[in-house]
Amino acid sequence: MATPNAQSGKITQVIGPVVDVEFPPGALPDIYTALSVTNPAIDARADNLVIEVSQHLGENTARCIAMDSTDGLVRGMVVRDTGAPISVPVGKEVLGRILNVVGDPVDERGPVASVRKFPIHRPAPTLVDQNVKIEAFETGIKVIDLLAPYLRGGKIGLFGGAGVGKTVLLMELVNNVAKKRGGFSVFAGVGERTREGNDLYHEMIESGVINKDDLSKSQCVLVYGQMNEPPGARARVALSALAIAEYFRDEEKRDMLLFIDNIFRFTQAGSEVSALLGRIPSAVGYQPTLSTEMGELQERITSTKNGAITSVQAIYVPADDLTDPAPATAFAHLDATTVLSRKLTEIGIYPAVDPLDSTSRILDPLVVGAEHYQVAREVQETLQRYKDLQDIIAILGMDELSEDDKLTVARARKVQRFLSQPFHVAEQFTGNPGKYVELADTIRGFKEIVEGKHDDLPEQAFYMVGGIEEAVEKAKKLAAG
């Protein structure tokens, strides 16, 4: 075993994913520095395990968190100081690839050709560099653009159980931002199932978001730190994905989409790491640094003069308790919420975005304009009235309603169906060509429905269409039989 020099130390203790390393006097590495050690239990490569300095214990000892398995490490092994934080490859060479927390490819397609690397720990853009203009981020998805518009450079919370269409919605957003804005997307799989990560990769290949034959034509990068990884990897993988997105925003001046699935697992991993480091837990057993860690991640996701990173974050709510410190801390940073409803999937409305539960900070006449705001509120009012009447309809039937209420119900059912939309990424399953609907067309379509311009058309004409003209055409075809 090599004798330690000024840039290397020796392992003195290994407790699970926590490794203590002793350095010669005066050679202690800074906090967040990446150290490397050869772990023969992982594979035959040298320096194959990265550990990150988290604490200075005194007596020239650094306490570190491992980014991979520590099985196979023994006391006395030599640890090399890399002199820099964990850095990941960036640039167009990473498009279409699956990377892990330290930027190594895990898709068995050879090494990443990128020559540039970005550190995963970076300061948030300064106030001077940030873009203060509040503008909506058009997605081309009617229900989102009308009722819960996304803020460019904002953070959106995505709520929904299993099988309600989170993945398909994410892929449609990736597709639309690439085709309409020339932007790329980065997907961070944080502490979720490996099987789901694999499914997503293959679905992206099928839908054309990742081009397997020519990776340079891909629109997305996948960065995974899944459930089976040590907590160090799960606590850092979101930062690795963010560094890749920051490169495209700052150096290539692109609009980026950053998906984090799941932001709760980021907090959960931080809690595990905190306990292993011996910190005294805070409320409900979470780490005392919960707000700081969340803030350091979220403040880097913003709009600058170069471009914007708009983030969509899936949020798991433990035991459906919205006051739990983990989701509650994430809520403080959100600009909009998109809630997916199982009831809508049961009646075949896709995307199953709940029009009454989803919210947005920028649905304000000063931001989106008076007409957009007015139409959105009228749509919600109509749907809310329909919801209130559903009990009466279930007990007494439609005939017992007043004429006004019958009209409201008819319009609400048309609105509900018009909120559905065929997706490009689902084309090969449904046979319906996908539709991107411009915001102006969305507003006009819903305005005409709530004003009663299309009261004579059957409600099925509004199902799975793009703009209102398409619904009118569909009605003509239905009438012609």
From Swiss-Prot:
Reaction(s) catalysed by this chain's protein: ATP + H2O + 4 H(+)(in) = ADP + phosphate + 5 H(+)(out)
EC number of this enzyme: 7.1.2.2
Residues binding ATP: 160-167
Quaternary state and interactors: F-type ATPases have 2 components, CF(1) - the catalytic core - and CF(0) - the membrane proton channel. CF(1) has five subunits: alpha(3), beta(3), gamma(1), delta(1), epsilon(1). CF(0) has three main subunits: a(1), b(2) and c(9-12). The alpha and beta chains form an alternating ring which encloses part of the gamma chain. CF(1) is attached to CF(0) by a central stalk formed by the gamma and epsilon chains, while a peripheral stalk is formed by the delta and b chains.
Function per UniProt: Produces ATP from ADP in the presence of a proton gradient across the membrane. The catalytic sites are hosted primarily by the beta subunits.
Alphabetical list of InterPro entries matching this protein: AAA+_ATPase, ATP-synt_VA_C, ATP_synth_F1_bsu, ATPase_a/bsu_AS, ATPase_alpha/beta_chains, ATPase_F1/V1/A1_a/bsu_N, ATPase_F1/V1/A1_a/bsu_N_sf, ATPase_F1/V1/A1_a/bsu_nucl-bd
Keywords: ATP synthesis, ATP-binding, Cell inner membrane, Cell membrane, CF(1), Hydrogen ion transport, Ion transport, Membrane, Nucleotide-binding, Translocase, Transport
A GO MF label: ATP binding
Membrane-topology annotation of the record: Peripheral membrane protein
Name listed for the protein in its UniProt record: ATP synthase subunit beta
Compartments where found: Cell inner membrane
Broad EC category: translocase
Main location: membrane
Family of this protein: Belongs to the ATPase alpha/beta chains family.
Signal peptide: none
Listed HAMAP family: ATP_synth_beta_bact
One annotated Gene Ontology cellular component of this protein: proton-transporting ATP synthase complex
Superkingdom of origin organism: Bacteria
